[in-house]
Design a protein with these regions (language model features):
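Basic, alpha-helical terminal appendages of large translation-related enzymes
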Residues: 117, 122-123, 132-221
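Short, charged/polar, low-complexity loop and linker segments
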Residues: 53-58, 109-117
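Short, small-residue-biased leader/transition segments that mark boundaries at the very start
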Residues: 1-6
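Catalytic adenosine-cofactor/nucleotide-binding cores of aminoacyl-tRNA synthetases and other
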Residues: 9-99, 193-215, 220
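Short hydrophobic "helix-edge" motifs at membrane interfaces and signal-peptide entry regions
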Residues: 26-27, 111-113, 170-172
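Short acidic/histidine-centered micro-motifs embedded in hydrophobic/aromatic stretches
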Residues: 8-9, 46, 130, 134, ...
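Conserved, charged catalytic cores of large soluble enzymes
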Residues: 77-115, 135, 139-155
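Secondary-structure capping and boundary motifs in well-ordered enzyme cores
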Residues: 20, 31-32, 61-72, 100-108, ...
Length: 221
């Protein structure tokens, strides 16, 4: 397997270039003692200085962890998994897709070319931002379709919404894998698929139980 080393610009900590010898910033091991490795990878990749020096603070790293990983991505996975497990004994694809479902799945299908091109150009910060934009799209889809309300009157439609969201979550895990491989694998291994595209939209199996998944990330106080 090929390894790629990227020589980048400098990361600044409180206006100074990070330097272990001068005591500016923390060592990697000091961060790993406190952080989920994937959360640390995300925080650092979000601040990658590709064209010019960039400044990063621990407060900003914590904010990204809490707001983007815990509240946006982790919460998305948890609420879809929980709603499927609590309301259906197995993954169901019952109702036909409607326009809002088709729109999300089309966007997820197109996401691979968009993010892939950014990665090929080594625009990793932009690729990560774009990947998280799709997480926001799935959250927006759920907020618009409100399956927790729909299920009270139309169980088949609620099942379709959650199935569509699960397909999109699987794609989000694919997009985020280059940046957060461990947690992405946790998500992907919990979702049963009919297809095994690592970089493409997958068809999710129906009639089977969804595996349990724990919290992906912990919130910093």
């Amino acid at each position: 397997q090929r390894q790629m080393c990227i020589r980048d610009r400098y990361i600044l900590v409180k206006g100074e270039k990070a330097s272990a010898s001068r005591g500016v910033g923390k060592t990697l091991q000091e961060y790993l003692d406190q952080w989920n490795p994937d959360a640390l990878r995300y925080a650092l990749a979000s601040a990658l200085p590709e064209q010019s020096d960039t400044e990063i603070s621990e407060d900003e790293m914590i904010r990204r962890n809490n707001e983007e990983l815990v509240a946006a991505w982790g919460n998305l996975v948890q609420r879809v998994f929980t709603q499927i497990q609590n309301n259906f004994s197995k993954i169901s694809e019952i109702d036909e897709t409607v326009e809002v479902d088709k729109k999300l799945l089309k966007e997820m299908s197109e996401s691979y070319d968009i993010v892939g091109q950014l990665i090929e150009k080594v625009e990793l910060k932009a690729a990560l931002q774009e990947s998280m934009r799709y997480v926001s799209k799935v959250n927006g889809y759920l907020n618009e379709t409100e399956p927790w309300k729909v299920i009270k009157e139309d169980e088949k439609r609620a099942a379709r919404i959650l199935y569509t969201a699960l397909e999109a979550i699987d794609s989000c895990a694919n997009l985020l894998y280059p940046f957060m491989p461990s947690t992405s694998d946790l998500v992907r291994s919990a979702i049963p698929r009919e297809t095994e595209n690592l970089w493409g939209l997958n068809k999710i199996k129906t009639g089977v139980e969804l595996k349990e998944i724990g919290l992906l990330f912990n919130k910093f106080d």
